[in-house]
C-alpha cells in the first residue's frame, strides 16, 4: 500500500511539474512606482501632458503602481535626456519629450542619441501659434512683422529654452520675413506665457496648451498657427474663437510650418516584454474619452505611432531637423 501511494504521489508530482512548465509566463508589469521624466519645467506642454496621462491612468486603474512625474529641466532639457540614458535597463522610468530628443544633442554636441533609448509611442503632434499681447496693436502677422522690420533687433520674442523649437521657429520667421528679434529664453512655455501677459516681451510662439488660459482670459491674441492646415477643432475657447478659427501662418503670407512630436521613451536595455507593456498602456490611454478631450482642449493633432513606424518617423524627423538647425546656424562648434 505504501509503495502504491508513493508511486501515485510521484506521478501526480510529475504531472504538476509538467503543467507548471507548460503554463504561459505571466506578462511583465511594474513592481514599484513608475517615474515619468519631463525634461522641461512645470507648466509647459510636456509637463501638462505627463500629468494628464498620470490622471487618466489613475482614474481608469490602467496600472497597479502609481506614477510620479519628475521635472528635470536643466541645460535646456539635457538633464532629463541624460538621466534617462543613464538609467539603462530601468523599466520603471519613462521619458516624455518632444523634438528636443534630437535637437538638444545636435545643437549642444551632447553625447546622446535617441537610439540609446527604447521607443514606446508617439501620442500626438503639437502645434505652435504666434501669440501677442491682446492689448498690442498687432491684429495680423503682417502688422506684427511690419513693426519688427521697422525696429530690427528691438522687439522681444520669448520662448522655451535656447536653440530649441521656439527659437528654431523664430529663426525661420526672421529668415522668411526679413526681420530680427531679441530672443528671450525661459525654462518653459508657462513662464513665456506669463511674461507676455505682463508685456515683458512682444510675442511668443507657444504651443496652444501653454497659452490657452491667457487666451481664454483675453490676455493673448492668436495671430496664426505654424501648421500645414488649420487646427481641426471647432469648439469655442474664447467668446468668439475656436482653435480652428486661427488662420495658418501661410494663409497670412508667412510661409513657415513646424509641428512637434510628443513621444514616450524607455531607457535602453529593457526587455521586449517591458516595452510591449508600455505600448499597450499608451494604447489604452489614447482610447479613453479623457484623452480625446485633452487633445481637443489643447489643440493637439491626434497621431499615434509605435513599433517600426515610430522608429521610421523618428529617423525622418531627425533628418528634417538637421537641415532646419543647420539653416538656423545653431549647430555648436566642435
Residue ranges: model-predicted function:
Residues 125, 211-287, 316-319:
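C-terminal lobe and pocket-closing loops
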Residues 26-116, 154, 178-203, 207, ...:
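N-terminal (or domain-start) structured segment
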Residues 1-12:
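Bacterial N-terminal signal peptides that target proteins for export
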Residues 73, 154, 158-245:
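Ligand-binding pocket segment of bilobal, Venus flytrap-like solute-binding proteins
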Residues 31-33, 175, 216, 272-334:
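An extracytoplasmic/periplasmic, membrane-proximal ligand-sensing/linker region
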Residues 15-25:
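C-terminal segment of classical bacterial N-terminal signal peptides
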Residues 83-92, 105-191, 249-251, 261-294:
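Hinge/capping helix and adjacent helix->loop/strand transition within the periplasmic-binding protein
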Amino acid at each position: 500500500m505504501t509503495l502504491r501511494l508513493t508511486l501515485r504521489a510521484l506521478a501526480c508530482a510529475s504531472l504538476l511539474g509538467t503543467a507548471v512548465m507548460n503554463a504561459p509566463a505571466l506578462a511583465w508589469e511594474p513592481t514599484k512606482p513608475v517615474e515619468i521624466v519631463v525634461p522641461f519645467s512645470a507648466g509647459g506642454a510636456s509637463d501638462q501632458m505627463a500629468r494628464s496621462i498620470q490622471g487618466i491612468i489613475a482614474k481608469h486603474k490602467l496600472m497597479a503602481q502609481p506614477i510620479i512625474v519628475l521635472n528635470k529641466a536643466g541645460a535646456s532639457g539635457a538633464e532629463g535626456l541624460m538621466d534617462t540614458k543613464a538609467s539603462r535597463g530601468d523599466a520603471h522610468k519613462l521619458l516624455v519629450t518632444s523634438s528636443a530628443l534630437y535637437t538638444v544633442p545636435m545643437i549642444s554636441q551632447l553625447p546622446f542619441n535617441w537610439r540609446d533609448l527604447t521607443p514606446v509611442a508617439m501620442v500626438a503632434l503639437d502645434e505652435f501659434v504666434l501669440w501677442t499681447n491682446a492689448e498690442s496693436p498687432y491684429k495680423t502677422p503682417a502688422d506684427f512683422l511690419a513693426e519688427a522690420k521697422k525696429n530690427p533687433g528691438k522687439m522681444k520674442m520669448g520662448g522655451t529654452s535656447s536653440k530649441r523649437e521656439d527659437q528654431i521657429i523664430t529663426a525661420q520667421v526672421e529668415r522668411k520675413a526679413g526681420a530680427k528679434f531679441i530672443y528671450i529664453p525661459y525654462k518653459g512655455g508657462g513662464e513665456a506665457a506669463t511674461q507676455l501677459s505682463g508685456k515683458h516681451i512682444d510675442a511668443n510662439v507657444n504651443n496652444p496648451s501653454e497659452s490657452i488660459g491667457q487666451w481664454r482670459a483675453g490676455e493673448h491674441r492668436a495671430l496664426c498657427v505654424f501648421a500645414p492646415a488649420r487646427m481641426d477643432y471647432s469648439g469655442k475657447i474664447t467668446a468668439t474663437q475656436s482653435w480652428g478659427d486661427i488662420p495658418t501662418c501661410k494663409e497670412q503670407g508667412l510661409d513657415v510650418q513646424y509641428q512637434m512630436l510628443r513621444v514616450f521613451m524607455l531607457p535602453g536595455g529593457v526587455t521586449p516584454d517591458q516595452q510591449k507593456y508600455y505600448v499597450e498602456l499608451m494604447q489604452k490611454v489614447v482610447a479613453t474619452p479623457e484623452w480625446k478631450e485633452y487633445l481637443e482642449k489643447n489643440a493637439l493633432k491626434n497621431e499615434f505611432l509605435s513599433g517600426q513606424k515610430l522608429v521610421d518617423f523618428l529617423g525622418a524627423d531627425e533628418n528634417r531637423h538637421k537641415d532646419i538647425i543647420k539653416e538656423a546656424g545653431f549647430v555648436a562648434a566642435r
